[in-house]
From Swiss-Prot:
It comes from Homo sapiens. This is Intercellular adhesion molecule 2. The lineage of its organism: Eukaryota, Metazoa, Chordata, Craniata, Vertebrata. Residues 41-98, 127-197 form the Ig-like C2-type domain. Residues 249-275 are cytoplasmic. Pfam families: ICAM_N. Disulfide bonds join 48-91, 52-95, 134-190. Gene3D superfamilies: Immunoglobulins. Keywords: Cell adhesion, Cell projection, Disulfide bond, Glycoprotein, Immunoglobulin domain, Membrane, Repeat, Signal, Transmembrane, Transmembrane helix.
Length: 275
């Protein structure tokens, strides 16, 4: 092929790729909002629009309840209600026989309304371990939740969660720590953060009620030996004193009974036998 023919073919291919014919008009479809988070049974307004001046047909595709609130040639405004699960809304328009669409992602959430903190045990010796547990019932989506465990202003532990089934779940974070002397003067607490920014929502925070430990000093082995010895001596003295009192009492009783016995026998002795 000659160089002229090669250049002609290249120009023709470039024209076909970059410059489509007038029967293939380029247009765009937009949806607002592109993503949004709503609570169960919630509703939202969705706007579908297009750059096509005279679209042939357009609308919103969804399995949920929808109402057309208003419309013009290039846009339609809907109310979508009774949203009970994550879903995708699809706006579509047809222009010159060609259809374009755009999706809106809707997420259902339940914010953390209750955060329960548990310390186990609540009475701990210095140097001994204890468990901090934070529990958040009925929250979703779990993959947007983070639980923070605090000792005073110090973050002891935080926990995130993987994607779970699209339903309210219970989230739990557990951390084992060692008690020190200052823990008896510190508040322990838990913070639940549900971050829905990536889903078109807000950030929700919920704190637990603060709790405190009761801390005591453990008794050393030498102290324990001294305590046991002292208790043993005191117990021995007590038992000895009780026994001595008992023996002394019996002795006195026998002495009294002996005197009374002689006198009684003397009274019973007939007069003839008395001196």
């Amino acid at each position: 092929m000659s160089s002229f023919g090669y250049r002609t073919l290249t120009v023709a291919l470039f024209t076909l790729i970059c410059c489509p014919g007038s029967d293939e008009k380029v247009f765009e479809v937009h949806v607002r909002p592109k993503k949004l988070a709503v609570e169960p049974k919630g509703s939202l307004e969705v706007n579908c629009s297009t750059t096509c001046n005279q679209p042939e047909v357009g609308g919103l595709e969804t399995s949920l309840d929808k109402i057309l609130l208003d419309e013009q040639a290039q846009w339609k405004h809907y109310l979508v209600s009774n949203i009970s699960h994550d879903t995708v809304l699809q706006c579509h328009f047809t222009c010159s026989g060609k259809q374009e669409s755009m999706n809106s992602n809707v997420s259902v959430y339940q914010p953390p309304r209750q955060v329960i903190l548990t310390l186990q045990p609540t009475l701990v010796a210095v140097g001994k371990s204890f468990t901090i547990e934070c529990r958040v019932p009925t929250v979703e989506p779990l993959d947007s939740l983070t639980l923070f465990l605090f000792r005073g202003n110090e973050t002891l532990h935080y926990e995130t969660f993987g994607k779970a089934a699209p339903a309210p779940q219970e989230a739990t974070a557990t951390f084992n720590s060692t008690a020190d002397r200052e823990d008896g003067h510190r508040n322990f607490s838990c913070l639940a953060v549900l971050d829905l920014m990536s889903r078109g929502g807000n950030i929700f925070h919920k704190h637990s009620a603060p709790k405190m430990l009761e801390i005591y000093e453990p008794v050393s082995d030498s102290q324990m030996v001294i305590i046991v010895t002292v208790v043993s001596v005191l117990l021995s003295l007590f038992v000895t004193s009780v026994l001595l009192c008992f023996i002394f009492g019996q002795h006195l009783r026998q002495q009294r009974m002996g005197t009374y016995g002689v006198r009684a026998a003397w009274r019973r002795l007939p007069q003839a036998f008395r001196p």
